[in-house]
Structures are given as C-alpha cells and as structure tokens.
Amino acid sequence: VQLQAALAQAPQGKPVTIRGKISAVEKQALKVTTSAGEVSVKLPDDVRIGGVETAQFSDIAAGKYVGTTAVKQADGSLKALEVHIFPESSRGTGEGHRPWDLQPGSTMTNANVEKVEQVAVEKIQGQLLTLKYKDGEQKIFIPPGTPIVRNVPGDRTLLKPGTGVYVAAVRGEDGTVTAIRITAGIGGIMPPM
C-alpha cells in the first residue's frame, strides 16, 4: 500500500538527466547551466539529495557495492569512465547492468565487487573489477586517472550556485522538469556519472 501511494505521488513524465552547474537556487527550484544551456528544475518537498566526494581506488575492495559508467572497447571489454562507491546503507540501489546516457554506447553497472586485480590492457596498467549482480557479472577495466567518488548523505544545503550536479528528473507534458534525485559535487567536483 505504501509503495502504491509513493508511486501515485511520484512526478509523471519522461525520465531525463541533467548534468551541469547550479546557476541559481530558489526555494522550490534550481537553475542549472548545462552544455545545452540553462534548465529550470522544480524541487518537490520530497526530492532526494545526496553528495559525492573524491575517493581513491584504494577505497574499492571486494565486498563493496559500487556503480560504474563504462564503454565497450574494440575487443568487447568494458573500460570505466567513472566509479562511484555506495555507502553500505545504499547496497542494492539500481543493481544490474544497463544502457546509460553519459555518452553514446555507455553502460551503468551497479553491483558488488567480487574481485580486484592489477592488470595491463594494451600496455596500460590498471585495475580489473569483477562486479556481480543478481542476474550476472561484468569485468570492467579501471585505467589510471578514472574519476572515483564516494556517495555520501546530503540535503538542500549542498545546493548552491557553482555546485556541479547530476539530476535524475522527469519532464512533464507541459515541459516542466521536476527533480526526483539530485547528486551534488562536494569540494568543487562535478558528479562524474
């Protein structure tokens, strides 16, 4: 019953993602400057807000729950564009492997880290993560310099002009964009997902 009530209250429309920097903050809205221009984003009272802070590869270990955006290489293997480490309380969030919209052909995998190995791919030293989820597994190469962040709790105090954000939202039939979840960069970073 609670799930049905929550779904009934969720904003209706086409899912959209917005990546950019906050240019203005109002009580119930944000203006976000993206590569395509400025977007006005409605902030409902129940919008979920979290942050990301810089992390290191050494923070990733077997048993952690992570998400990674990757692209397929010519040989069919996956190369990470970014990795985000979830807190234990978020284990299971978006679990699985699916298409993603960071760039053409990109994918998102949210899964448990099964194994971490040191490898060389085309003479580039890096790490190979074996990620396991309910219906399968993926092996993803993490080259040096790949952005790695840690998801942390957040609230509206993170939403300030100049802050980099990733916004999961819906666009209504009237064109209004309503945020469902906002991830804000902490310490000047841009959420890499």
Q: Where do the protein language model's features map onto the residues?
A:
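Short, flexible, surface-exposed loop segments at domain boundaries
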Residues: V1-M193
